[in-house]
Amino acid sequence: ATPSNTVYPGNPNGYESPETTHYSVVDQWGNAVSVTTTINLSYGNGCIVEGAGFFLNNEMDDFSAKPGVPNAFGLIGNEANAIAPGTRPLSSMTPTIVMKDNKPFLVVGSPGGSTIITTTMQTILNVINFEMDIKEAVCAPRFHSQWLPDVIQIEPRGLSQDVLSNLRLRGHKIIYRGGYIGESNGIMITSEGLFGGGDCRGETSAIGY
Protein backbone atom coordinates (compact mmCIF):
# COMPACT_ATOMS: atom_id res chain seq x y z
CA ALA A 1 0.00 0.00 0.00
CA THR A 2 1.09 3.57 -0.60
CA PRO A 3 1.78 5.45 2.67
CA SER A 4 -0.70 8.31 2.98
CA ASN A 5 2.02 10.85 3.76
CA THR A 6 3.56 10.27 0.31
CA VAL A 7 0.36 10.99 -1.64
CA TYR A 8 0.02 14.54 -2.97
CA PRO A 9 -2.33 16.28 -5.43
CA GLY A 10 -1.40 15.66 -9.03
CA ASN A 11 -1.64 12.88 -11.55
CA PRO A 12 -2.86 9.74 -9.71
CA ASN A 13 -2.04 7.36 -12.55
CA GLY A 14 1.47 6.87 -11.25
CA TYR A 15 0.39 5.29 -7.99
CA GLU A 16 -3.25 4.26 -8.24
CA SER A 17 -5.04 1.79 -10.49
CA PRO A 18 -8.60 2.56 -11.62
CA GLU A 19 -9.77 -0.98 -10.95
CA THR A 20 -10.68 -3.35 -8.14
CA THR A 21 -7.89 -4.32 -5.73
CA HIS A 22 -7.06 -7.85 -4.66
CA TYR A 23 -4.35 -8.97 -2.26
CA SER A 24 -3.37 -12.38 -0.90
CA VAL A 25 -1.48 -12.64 2.40
CA VAL A 26 0.01 -15.48 4.47
CA ASP A 27 1.88 -14.85 7.72
CA GLN A 28 4.65 -16.78 9.48
CA TRP A 29 2.12 -18.86 11.41
CA GLY A 30 0.22 -19.95 8.32
CA ASN A 31 -2.75 -17.62 8.77
CA ALA A 32 -4.09 -16.75 5.32
CA VAL A 33 -6.36 -14.01 4.00
CA SER A 34 -7.68 -13.36 0.51
CA VAL A 35 -9.21 -9.90 0.11
CA THR A 36 -10.96 -8.26 -2.84
CA THR A 37 -12.18 -4.69 -2.40
CA THR A 38 -13.77 -2.29 -4.85
CA ILE A 39 -15.88 0.80 -5.40
CA ASN A 40 -17.05 -0.88 -8.63
CA LEU A 41 -16.50 1.58 -11.50
CA SER A 42 -13.82 4.27 -11.64
CA TYR A 43 -14.62 6.95 -9.02
CA GLY A 44 -17.57 4.87 -7.74
CA ASN A 45 -20.76 6.90 -7.89
CA GLY A 46 -18.78 10.14 -8.25
CA CYS A 47 -19.61 11.42 -4.75
CA ILE A 48 -16.88 12.16 -2.21
CA VAL A 49 -17.63 11.98 1.51
CA GLU A 50 -17.15 15.54 2.73
CA GLY A 51 -14.32 15.84 5.22
CA ALA A 52 -13.20 12.23 4.67
CA GLY A 53 -11.88 12.38 1.12
CA PHE A 54 -13.01 9.02 -0.26
CA PHE A 55 -15.49 8.07 -2.96
CA LEU A 56 -18.74 6.24 -2.33
CA ASN A 57 -19.14 3.08 -4.39
CA ASN A 58 -21.73 2.40 -7.05
CA GLU A 59 -22.22 -1.28 -6.25
CA MET A 60 -25.94 -0.77 -6.92
CA ASP A 61 -24.98 -1.50 -10.54
CA ASP A 62 -24.45 -5.12 -9.46
CA PHE A 63 -28.22 -5.37 -9.01
CA SER A 64 -30.43 -5.85 -12.05
CA ALA A 65 -31.79 -2.31 -12.17
CA LYS A 66 -33.70 -3.25 -15.31
CA PRO A 67 -34.04 -7.03 -15.87
CA GLY A 68 -32.88 -8.11 -19.31
CA VAL A 69 -30.71 -5.03 -19.83
CA PRO A 70 -26.91 -5.44 -19.41
CA ASN A 71 -25.07 -3.58 -16.66
CA ALA A 72 -21.72 -1.80 -17.02
CA PHE A 73 -19.91 -5.16 -17.37
CA GLY A 74 -22.34 -6.60 -19.91
CA LEU A 75 -23.98 -8.92 -17.39
CA ILE A 76 -27.68 -9.47 -17.96
CA GLY A 77 -29.73 -10.14 -14.83
CA ASN A 78 -33.34 -10.88 -14.02
CA GLU A 79 -35.89 -10.34 -11.25
CA ALA A 80 -34.00 -12.62 -8.83
CA ASN A 81 -31.29 -9.94 -8.60
CA ALA A 82 -33.64 -6.95 -8.56
CA ILE A 83 -33.15 -4.00 -6.19
CA ALA A 84 -35.19 -4.64 -3.04
CA PRO A 85 -34.99 -3.85 0.70
CA GLY A 86 -32.81 -6.20 2.75
CA THR A 87 -31.09 -7.76 -0.26
CA ARG A 88 -27.53 -7.75 -1.51
CA PRO A 89 -26.48 -7.74 -5.17
CA LEU A 90 -24.71 -10.54 -6.95
CA SER A 91 -20.98 -9.92 -7.19
CA SER A 92 -18.16 -11.37 -9.26
CA MET A 93 -15.61 -10.83 -6.47
CA THR A 94 -14.00 -14.19 -5.71
CA PRO A 95 -11.36 -14.00 -2.96
CA THR A 96 -10.41 -17.65 -2.57
CA ILE A 97 -8.51 -19.93 -0.21
CA VAL A 98 -8.07 -23.51 -1.45
CA MET A 99 -7.59 -26.07 1.32
CA LYS A 100 -5.50 -29.25 1.13
CA ASP A 101 -5.42 -31.73 4.01
CA ASN A 102 -7.37 -29.18 6.09
CA LYS A 103 -4.65 -26.56 5.61
CA PRO A 104 -4.46 -23.55 3.26
CA PHE A 105 -2.80 -24.54 -0.02
CA LEU A 106 -3.63 -21.67 -2.40
CA VAL A 107 -4.59 -18.07 -1.64
CA VAL A 108 -5.76 -16.38 -4.85
CA GLY A 109 -7.96 -13.69 -6.38
CA SER A 110 -8.11 -10.98 -9.01
CA PRO A 111 -9.67 -7.69 -10.08
CA GLY A 112 -11.52 -7.58 -13.38
CA GLY A 113 -15.27 -7.16 -12.95
CA SER A 114 -17.18 -10.02 -14.54
CA THR A 115 -13.90 -11.73 -15.53
CA ILE A 116 -12.86 -12.30 -11.90
CA ILE A 117 -14.61 -15.66 -11.59
CA THR A 118 -13.07 -17.15 -14.72
CA THR A 119 -9.66 -15.64 -13.94
CA THR A 120 -9.60 -17.15 -10.45
CA MET A 121 -10.90 -20.51 -11.68
CA GLN A 122 -8.25 -20.73 -14.41
CA THR A 123 -5.49 -19.80 -11.95
CA ILE A 124 -6.57 -22.63 -9.63
CA LEU A 125 -6.86 -25.13 -12.50
CA ASN A 126 -3.42 -24.12 -13.77
CA VAL A 127 -1.90 -25.13 -10.43
CA ILE A 128 -3.95 -28.23 -9.64
CA ASN A 129 -4.68 -29.73 -13.07
CA PHE A 130 -1.76 -28.44 -15.14
CA GLU A 131 0.82 -28.53 -12.32
CA MET A 132 2.12 -25.01 -12.89
CA ASP A 133 3.89 -23.08 -10.18
CA ILE A 134 1.98 -20.05 -8.91
CA LYS A 135 3.90 -17.56 -11.07
CA GLU A 136 3.19 -19.54 -14.23
CA ALA A 137 -0.43 -19.99 -13.17
CA VAL A 138 -1.20 -16.28 -12.77
CA CYS A 139 0.64 -15.29 -15.96
CA ALA A 140 -0.78 -17.98 -18.28
CA PRO A 141 -3.08 -16.87 -21.15
CA ARG A 142 -6.77 -16.67 -20.28
CA PHE A 143 -10.21 -16.68 -21.87
CA HIS A 144 -13.59 -15.56 -20.56
CA SER A 145 -17.23 -16.43 -21.13
CA GLN A 146 -20.17 -15.18 -19.07
CA TRP A 147 -23.05 -16.86 -21.00
CA LEU A 148 -24.61 -13.56 -22.09
CA PRO A 149 -23.44 -12.20 -24.40
CA ASP A 150 -22.89 -15.73 -25.78
CA VAL A 151 -19.29 -15.28 -26.92
CA ILE A 152 -15.86 -16.48 -25.82
CA GLN A 153 -13.49 -13.60 -25.18
CA ILE A 154 -9.78 -14.31 -25.49
CA GLU A 155 -6.58 -12.39 -25.02
CA PRO A 156 -4.46 -11.87 -28.16
CA ARG A 157 -2.26 -14.79 -27.08
CA GLY A 158 -5.06 -16.66 -25.34
CA LEU A 159 -5.73 -19.85 -27.31
CA SER A 160 -3.93 -21.75 -30.06
CA GLN A 161 -5.30 -21.64 -33.60
CA ASP A 162 -6.32 -25.32 -33.59
CA VAL A 163 -8.37 -24.79 -30.42
CA LEU A 164 -9.97 -21.67 -31.92
CA SER A 165 -10.82 -23.57 -35.11
CA ASN A 166 -12.43 -26.41 -33.16
CA LEU A 167 -14.47 -23.98 -31.07
CA ARG A 168 -15.72 -22.22 -34.20
CA LEU A 169 -16.66 -25.58 -35.76
CA ARG A 170 -18.80 -26.22 -32.67
CA GLY A 171 -20.64 -22.96 -33.23
CA HIS A 172 -18.86 -20.72 -30.71
CA LYS A 173 -18.27 -17.07 -31.52
CA ILE A 174 -14.74 -15.94 -30.64
CA ILE A 175 -13.83 -12.31 -30.04
CA TYR A 176 -10.48 -10.80 -29.12
CA ARG A 177 -10.69 -8.72 -25.98
CA GLY A 178 -8.96 -5.37 -25.95
CA GLY A 179 -6.34 -5.45 -23.22
CA TYR A 180 -5.99 -8.29 -20.76
CA ILE A 181 -8.35 -10.49 -18.75
CA GLY A 182 -7.93 -10.12 -15.00
CA GLU A 183 -4.76 -9.42 -13.02
CA SER A 184 -4.43 -12.39 -10.70
CA ASN A 185 -2.11 -12.82 -7.76
CA GLY A 186 -1.67 -15.68 -5.36
CA ILE A 187 0.39 -17.62 -2.85
CA MET A 188 1.09 -21.35 -2.91
CA ILE A 189 1.80 -22.95 0.45
CA THR A 190 3.88 -26.14 0.38
CA SER A 191 6.14 -28.10 2.71
CA GLU A 192 9.05 -26.21 1.14
CA GLY A 193 7.65 -22.79 2.06
CA LEU A 194 5.57 -19.97 0.60
CA PHE A 195 5.66 -19.15 -3.11
CA GLY A 196 4.08 -15.93 -4.38
CA GLY A 197 3.06 -15.01 -7.90
CA GLY A 198 2.15 -11.61 -9.33
CA ASP A 199 0.45 -11.38 -12.72
CA CYS A 200 2.69 -10.27 -15.60
CA ARG A 201 -0.20 -8.26 -17.06
CA GLY A 202 -0.08 -5.30 -14.73
CA GLU A 203 1.63 -3.84 -11.68
CA THR A 204 0.99 -6.86 -9.46
CA SER A 205 4.01 -8.18 -7.56
CA ALA A 206 4.88 -10.70 -4.87
CA ILE A 207 6.88 -9.67 -1.81
CA GLY A 208 7.92 -11.42 1.39
CA TYR A 209 9.91 -10.69 4.50
Regions found by a protein language model. Give the residues of each.
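C-terminal catalytic domains of large/alpha subunits in multi-subunit enzymes
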Residues: A1-S17, W29, D62, A82-S92, ...
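A short acidic/small-residue loop/turn micro-motif
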Residues: N40-S42, G112-G113
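Signal/transit-peptide handling
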Residues: F54-A82, T96, P104-F105, T115, ...
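Internal maturation/activation junctions in enzymes
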Residues: A1-T38, G51-A52, E59, K66-P70, ...
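A short, polar/charged loop-to-alpha-helix boundary motif
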Residues: S42-F55, T118-Q122
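Short, charged, low-complexity patches
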Residues: G113-M121, I134
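Short, charged/polar low-complexity linear motifs in solvent-exposed/disordered segments
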Residues: E50-G53, G74, T123-N126, I154-R157
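Extracytoplasmic/secreted cell-surface and envelope-processing proteins
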Residues: G44-N45, A65-K66, I116-T118, D162-V163
